């Protein structure tokens, strides 16, 4: 209901082929509005929701077409109107029923029949998806939307509906087989969600109308696919290989799969997503949820490998939002939405994504994707051998995971990348989560016929420092830094490079400049045989508290699971803060957040007990940290560390005695969407916002030096109410040039309303909110900002 209130302040959608090809964003806006409004009418009986929904229905029915040229648009709009037509049927006037039914038939069903028949008809399509011998997300989306439309009007046009049923149900046979053998989706997690959302909608409608899903739920991989999407999602987002964007996949489809497959553990997994990971429910969660399946905890493996798509994931824990997550991908390049990303990986740990995948570029750039940085090997966390205009990996190449093993304290995967590199005799890459799942090894073994130029890349949004000797580097993080070092005396050095094409690569001026990214590079010249063994360990950025783990370099052929047990690592048995037990404490959870009263300035007293010698160190002030170190009683070099981030509580309103400060001017570092300007953060309207991608900032000029004590911040949530948390720093300046950081925090992700953050009282004229992305992606969106002080 809270989301639908925005619709009453906006006009219905209008026809707009915004990029010369797609109506898609208009279709999705209409879909969200009509389904949310119709659902609220069904739940409350309040006619204002139905009346506002009808305004959207009239608008889309009056469109000249639903853009069958880009047929995804037609499918999405057909489904959207069909839902509204069905859910409001008894409320609609006879004329409105006729209008909606006619639009579904003429603008939807008749269009897909042209594709099914494939007769010369003068139709124009971006491509003939229905005739493609290889299936992808289009197959499920296009057929599903129109099949739902056919079900909505079948009683009135049975012959047309029957032809759509025959054509659509036949075509999706090859699409559902893509979930095999283990539930993965080769186009990446973003297209898994797109395809699976339409697949589950269709299955739900078939079950509702015919009480039968005609065997489409009984294909290889369907029973595992809910576990697939969960397993490749880390604490900081999904493993967005191929054409996927970073973000946490919000998947109510899991409830549907759990219900139809009678999998109580899978149902509980979705419940845990919403309860523990900040993901709020959607309409489909309500529709798909079966309360009779609750109560069975999901038993998730820490490591997964999915064949054919050739993707694997490893993690230290499932219940800790600061756990370590490693996602790795081999696979093929020449597939729909494919990249030259064999051997690539992402790495999360302690609230930071240290190794990032850049995702797709603008689909409308008129150039081969293999000329664009984000699609080439150099744009991924993998190897490039002898850089040239070629993409860096073979277009027809295929890489596979030859060995995968998972144990209690470690897991690893070894890839054969030889087929991807034309100048190589053999290329193997191994990934290992080691040291009781607290460190990562990435090891490459390369042989070439002739001496070669070898590059190793890792992209990140974080700051990087390289040691003077070039043999190690540090990637900065939220709680811990990532120390990257060589395990052997390997020729070559580390350096920091921009995330941009090398001199030997094509230079397309239209492509994304990737300004929020940089990359750590390792370069070895004139080598024909080399092993590059790299250790990545997470270290606390406080002097004297470094934890150093050493391990010998072992050939990949000799890799085994770690034999040492977790019990050998000293653990805490309790932590108290000011005499009270630390909420959520677990011996194997190493990062905590603790909030004190907003008016308190005193660091709380932290005490702990454990299996070793315990010591506690604090930073000087709040917000800050308490770091607990446990040394083994026998070998003091064996240590374990726990971190408590201590901050002040977030308030719902500013306390008495402070005033709202007036703002003379507001500016932003970038305004990529003119309608989402920085001025929107001062208009008192939670339906408007300022949005910018990546590391962006917004600056408020108070006109004169003022004392600033509190920041009010409201964060945009999308139509799925996705629970996004905004990460930000607060900096203050007297002259607008020299800034001092005074606060670093994150929104709760639980409300659309403004939250009040206590910050250390600071004088200044300019206040900068430095935004660092959200828990679901790289876009920052602030709806309101208010400063309070004296």
What are these regions (language model features)?
Residues 365-575, 582-588:
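CBM-like, beta-strand-rich accessory domains located in the C-terminal region of large
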Residues 126-130, 153, 191-354, 406, ...:
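Carbohydrate-active enzyme catalytic cores, enriched for enzymes
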Residues 11-30, 62-75, 117-141, 180-194, ...:
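Solvent-exposed loop and edge beta-strand segments that line ligand/cofactor-binding
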Residues 14-21, 82-190, 285-301:
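Active-site lining segments of carbohydrate-active enzymes
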Residues 1, 41-54, 85-109, 150-169, ...:
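Structural helix-adjacent loops and short alpha-helical linkers that scaffold large soluble proteins
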Residues 31-47, 59-67, 77-96, 142-158, ...:
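Well-ordered alpha-helical scaffold segments within catalytic/enzyme domains
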Residues 675, 681-743, 750-790:
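Aromatic, loop-rich ligand-recognition surfaces of beta-strand-rich domains
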Residues 562-657:
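Beta-rich interaction/scaffold domains
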